[in-house]
Amino acid sequence: MVDPISNAAPPMPADSSERLDPPGFAEAPHYHGHRERLRERFREAGAAALSDYELLELVLFRALPRRDVKPLAKALIARFGSFAETMQAPEPRLREVSGLGEAAITEIKLVAAAAARVTKGQVKSRTVLSSWSAVIDYCRTTMAFADREQFRILFLDKRNQLIADELQQVGTVDHTPVYPREIVKRALELSATAVIMVHNHPSGDPTPSQADIQMTKTIVAIAEPLGVAVHDHIIVGKNGHASLKGLKLF
């Protein structure tokens, strides 16, 4: 038997939290307005108007479209220290953060890769010694926040333009093995007439050690008789950079 259709209105929910919205009029999550306001601030005033966690929120929006990402962004900054350090954090450490999935990690690494590509382009397109600030920016972007020591060589031609940028060695948290004769051999293979050596200090303090100074002098002694100049040895860290040439240490 079919029940008769009642003309009476359906009962209202007893609790207003159970209110039924008409189709097409569902209330937007509270964070949608926040996202639009944050984007608007970025469009109008740029990144300088945003704190580190707010800039990180913008990075996470696309990977996590249905979540309030502010707590996650704040947690990442608290864990790693800054926006830059979060971008450079190793993927295994990022995976330790609760709520940060592979899509979000990919977004973070994409931003880091884009920044490195931009700064490298600024170095490649100019004479290196006439764009020293671009060299420093590139070295800090690619190496300053790494959790292990890295040793990189910029090989230059006779016009001091970049021929090659090669990561030679990756070591431990406080040591990288360096082979001076291999560095000079590689310079000759590339027909480079000069090199700039770069390595990082994961501790954040770029102060040269005695081992750094001695290794630099050894490379200079091998390279110069073969026509390869050592323009500088730069050490980068979270807290700045040091130029052994500028400090007159070789």
Curated annotation (Swiss-Prot):
Q: Where is the MPN domain?
A: 128-250
Binding-site list for Zn(2+): H199, H201, D212
> Protease as a keyword?
yes
NCBIfam families tied to this protein: PRK00024.1, radc
| The protein's name in its UniProt record | UPF0758 protein RPB_0700
What UniProt keywords apply to this chain's record, in alphabetical order? Hydrolase, Metal-binding, Metalloprotease, Protease, Zinc
Q: Which domain of life is it from?
A: Bacteria
Q: Which Pfam families match?
A: RadC (PF04002), UPF0758_N (PF20582)
Q: Which organism is it from?
A: Rhodopseudomonas palustris (strain HaA2)
- Its Gene Ontology biological processes? proteolysis
